[in-house]
């Protein structure tokens, strides 16, 4: 845990947020110290004080920044101000009033000042780092009253020698929640004070219906409470561990019992106690509006199903409990669907379109992995209820869409956001092509959101389900609500996950931030990306050229001779060179070769990558013809370096053959050759060079790509295939691809070589490509066009194998940001994560910007809102009246706390 005075980046970000929302403390608001060490803490009246002229009244300001109650609420709830480009998180479909965050403010306000200092703010951020932050803040809230009582007792008995100060001091001290030896069993709350605090909450809430019907939770009536009490110095205490257990178990049952007991009436027809639909909806809103989707309350219609022995006017206790049982296990059902999605590798479209029947649902529930994991069972009645709720919700959305009636749907009105609309109609239409697919994906989600999640998922892939054995046994005759055959996975997730829609919006926030970053730097990105590919291509080219240079040397000697008088074949050439010139002779001209091959191979590899990316279609596919065009373009672009390189290299490689004829020519250096030829001479034979390199690359690169795909099952776009190859596989694919490309282009290589060297005495001088072809056919034979063909295959095949293998390995070892994305291509899946804070990056197959998985928050962005919602839910779980906590209730609590210590 970081210290409060830490200067880490995280603390600087926290300070930035604090300053953005903070107000300036005034002299009237600052706490005043008194002689006994206690504080007189007046209420903060105004956080933005101004003088009569409308400007800040500097005489009243202390310069200290603080967060008032309103500042803190605004900070937590208005994430749109800093972090979000789209929404203020109003897409959360469970209802958590923002004023409930005042409970957090009260809990972390040290010394009950009425405002938060910077240290208080840092302390709050530190608490959020703990796994059980919501329980810790709940404990701090109630502990404040215990501490004030202890201080009052200490103040009263300060002069008494019989007063044991140690016990009081230990309770007053701040708690190190990072202590790994700390147990929740050691964190105690005075039970009587705890009850008084709950009673104070009830007194502060003005709800006559709740009070008249005795729906308030009275802790004095809880029979189970005696089993959780512990005693210290003759007083009753409740440990935090016990309180958590009560929250998870006993309190849920008490709420159900009290709610039904207080509102149920005798049904004369069914001869049983029952609730009406309105009473049921009221209790659900009262106890579970913060936990479930708001759409559920309008989807509880029991009159359109005959599989449940209840209707809207008579809902018995067992159906009432079944509904609450479902609510309590929505998270589990949500995880089951996630597991199903993961096991079947479903994508977003599948989730929108795949049909879920009761038979499918039962198959998933009864799967062996669920049984092994002790997935709890659901009764037929509970499953019928679930399908009824989901079906009613879908039907309601369909009717709302048909009638275009949004006046009665406050949530739906709020789902339309002008910022999203602006983004679609501006950046989407004028965005760069690199982000096009990402923006189109964004546009698909936008239509769902702007319709207020009213989109009726079409059934495209799955056919209409037939009635199976399960339906026959449990369903009887057809049932309109529970036997629908068009309910999709998405329909269930909208009910089971109250943040379903907000997760989609949050994903868009991340996408838009990333897209903005891309647009800002877009003009520089191709430069850096090309430099990256150019550098790696240069290194890889040098490695490949060095490995096969002796073979290239022999190939050139064989192509240069016009008869078999000197070298009979490649082996004979190799032996004679070694005997006359030594091993060193095989590397004559390597220096200029390395100087030129770096940019040559770099240009070829970079242009090929560039063209393949440009010609890839929207689905991430590249057909054969664009592959050929990409390779041909790469071959054409490399000639600007290849031709000067080749002519100097070839002349150095054959110069020893001129020893007996021209001593000066036999001893020329690379520099002298360049000066002698001049710029124009360096491009002799450029047409022949193009005729060789363009078809070579047009053959080589598509062949290499298809060998990787067909021979080694490599396809990063297909998650069922491999997305990475071993080194030997890359070498093999590169070598095999080089064989046909090298051999078929050998005639053009022979012509180029002949044009780029000076003829020996008695040999015909070629005047151009066609003259060279006619002369070779006349003086030699057709076979001469394939001189050195074997050596060329042996040279080109491994050279490009080594070059491309090195290139791809270097891209893996030294990844650019873009390649980091590509290294995880095709892994588009939904994952179950026990930690909701963890993120799962989803990458498009063409290396586009990453997306965050739908069903979790994102730690790269501030989570104040999400974590504060979790804290607020814990308070409301304890007592639903915390949902009405506001500034007036806060003042009552603050005044009561001050009154304890006089």
Swiss-Prot record:
SUPFAM superfamilies: Mitochondrial carrier. It is found in: Mitochondrion inner membrane. It comes from Saccharomyces cerevisiae (strain ATCC 204508 / S288c). One of its GO terms (molecular function) is L-glutamate transmembrane transporter activity. It comes from the Eukaryota. The gene is AGC1. One of its GO terms (cellular component) is mitochondrial inner membrane. GO terms for biological process: aspartate transmembrane transport; biosynthetic process; L-glutamate transmembrane transport; malate-aspartate shuttle. Solcar repeats lie at residues 528-614, 622-710, 725-813. Calcium-dependent mitochondrial aspartate and glutamate carrier. Transport of glutamate in mitochondria is required for mitochondrial transamination reactions and ornithine synthesis. Plays also a role in malate-aspartate NADH shuttle, which is critical for growth on acetate and fatty acids. Belongs to the mitochondrial carrier (TC 2.A.29) family. It is a multi-pass membrane protein. The chain crosses the membrane at residues 534-554, 591-611, 622-642, 681-702, 731-751, 786-806. This is Mitochondrial aspartate-glutamate transporter AGC1. InterPro entries: Mit_carrier, Mito_Solute_Carrier, Mitochondrial_sb/sol_carrier, Mt_carrier_dom_sf. Keywords: Amino-acid transport, Calcium, Membrane, Mitochondrion, Mitochondrion inner membrane, Repeat, Transmembrane, Transmembrane helix, Transport. Pfam families: Mito_carr.
């Amino acid at each position: 845990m970081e210290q409060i005075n830490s200067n880490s980046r995280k603390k600087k970000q926290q300070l930035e947020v604090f300053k953005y929302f903070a107000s300036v403390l005034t002299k009237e608001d600052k706490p005043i110290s008194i002689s006994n060490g206690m504080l007189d803490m007046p209420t903060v009246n105004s956080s933005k004080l101004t003088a009569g002229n409308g400007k800040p009244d500097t005489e009243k300001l202390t310069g200290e920044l603080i967060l008032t109650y309103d500042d803190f609420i605004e900070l937590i709830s208005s994430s749109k101000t800093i972090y979000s480009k789209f929404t203020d998180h109003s897409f959360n479909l469970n209802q958590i009033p923002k004023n409930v965050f005042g409970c957090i403010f009260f809990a972390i306000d040290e010394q009950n000042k009425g405002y938060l200092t910077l240290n208080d703010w840092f302390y709050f951020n530190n608490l959020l780092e703990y796994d059980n932050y919501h329980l810790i803040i709940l404990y701090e809230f109630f502990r404040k009253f215990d501490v004030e009582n202890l201080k009052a007792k200490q103040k009263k008995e300060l002069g008494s020698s019989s007063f044991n100060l140690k016990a009081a001091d230990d309770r007053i001290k701040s708690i190190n929640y990072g202590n790994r030896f700390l147990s929740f069993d050691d964190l105690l709350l005075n039970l009587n004070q705890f009850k008084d605090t709950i009673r104070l909450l009830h007194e502060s809430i003005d709800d006559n219906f709740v009070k008249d019907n005795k729906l308030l939770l009275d802790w004095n009536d809880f029979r189970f409470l005696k089993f959780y009490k512990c005693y210290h110095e003759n007083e009753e205490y409740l440990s935090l561990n016990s309180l958590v257990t009560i929250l998870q178990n006993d309190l849920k049952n008490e709420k159900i019992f009290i709610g039904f007991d207080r509102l149920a009436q005798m049904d004369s027809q069914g001869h049983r106690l029952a609730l009406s639909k309105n009473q049921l909806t009221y209790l659900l809103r009262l106890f579970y509006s913060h936990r479930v989707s708001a759409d559920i309350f309008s989807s509880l219609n029991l009159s359109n199903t005959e599989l449940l022995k209840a209707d809207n006017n008579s809902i018995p206790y067992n159906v009432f409990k079944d509904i609450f049982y479902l609510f309590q296990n929505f998270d589990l059902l949500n995880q089951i669907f996630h597991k199903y999605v993961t096991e079947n590798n479903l994508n977003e479209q599948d989730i929108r379109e795949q049909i879920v029947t009761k038979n499918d649902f039962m198959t998933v529930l009864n799967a062996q992995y669920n049984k092994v994991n002790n997935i709890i069972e659901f009764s037929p009645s509970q499953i019928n209820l679930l399908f009824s709720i989901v079906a009613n919700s879908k039907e309601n959305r369909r009717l709302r869409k048909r009638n275009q009636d949004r006046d009665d749907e406050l949530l739906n009105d709020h789902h339309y956001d002008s910022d999203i609309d602006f983004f679609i109609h501006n950046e989407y239409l004028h965005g760069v092509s690199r982000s096009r697919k990402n923006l189109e994906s964004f546009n698909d989600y936008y239509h769902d959101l702007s319709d207020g999640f009213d989109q009726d998922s079409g059934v495209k892939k799955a056919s209409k389900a037939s009635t199976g054995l399960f339906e026959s046994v449990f369903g009887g005759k057809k049932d309109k609500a529970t036997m629908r055959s068009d309910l999709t996975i998405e329909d269930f997730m909208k009910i089971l996950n109250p943040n379903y829609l907000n997760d989609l919006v949050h994903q868009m926030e991340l996408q838009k931030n990333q897209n903005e970053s891309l647009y800002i730097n877009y003009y520089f990105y191709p430069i850096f990306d090309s430099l990256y590919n150019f550098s790696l291509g240069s290194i890889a080219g040098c490695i490949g050229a060095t490995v096969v240079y002796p073979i290239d040397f022999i190939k050139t000697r064989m192509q240069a001779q016009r008869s078999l008088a000197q070298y009979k074949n490649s082996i004979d050439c190799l032996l004679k060179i070694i005997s006359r010139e030594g091993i060193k002779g095989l590397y004559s001209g390597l220096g200029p070769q390395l100087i030129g091959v770096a940019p040559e191979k770099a240009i070829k590899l970079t242009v090929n990558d560039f063209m393949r990316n440009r010609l890839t279609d929207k689905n991430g596919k590249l057909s054969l013809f664009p592959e050929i065009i990409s390779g041909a373009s790469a071959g054409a672009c490399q000639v600007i370096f290849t031709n000067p390189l080749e002519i100097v290299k070839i002349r150095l490689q054959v110069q020893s053959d001129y020893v007996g004829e021209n001593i000066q020519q036999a001893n020329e250096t690379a520099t002298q050759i360049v000066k002698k030829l001049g710029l124009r001479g360096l491009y002799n034979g450029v047409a022949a060079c193009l005729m060789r390199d363009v078809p070579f690359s047009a053959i080589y690169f598509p062949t290499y790509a298809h060998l990787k795909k067909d021979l080694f099952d490599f396809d990063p776009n297909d998650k069922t295939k491999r997305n990475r190859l071993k080194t030997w596989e890359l070498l093999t694919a590169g070598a095999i691809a080089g064989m046909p490309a090298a051999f078929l282009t050998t005639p053009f290589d022979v012509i180029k070589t002949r044009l780029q060297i000076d003829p020996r005495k008695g040999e015909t001088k070629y005047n151009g490509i066609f003259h060279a072809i006619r002369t070779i056919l006349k003086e030699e034979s057709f076979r001469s066009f394939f001189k050195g063909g074997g050596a060329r295959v042996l040279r080109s095949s491994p050279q490009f194998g080594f070059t491309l293998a090195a290139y791809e390995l270097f891209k893996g070892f030294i990844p650019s940001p873009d390649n980091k994305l590509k290294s995880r291509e095709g892994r588009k899946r939904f994952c179950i994560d026990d930690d909701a804070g963890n993120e799962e990056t989803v990458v498009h197959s063409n290396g586009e910007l990453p997306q965050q998985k739908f069903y979790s928050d994102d730690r790269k962005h501030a989570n104040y809102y999400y974590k504060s919602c979790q804290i607020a839910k814990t308070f409301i779980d304890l007592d639903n009246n915390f949902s009405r906590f506001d500034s007036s209730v806060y003042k009552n609590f603050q005044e009561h706390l001050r009154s304890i210590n006089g």
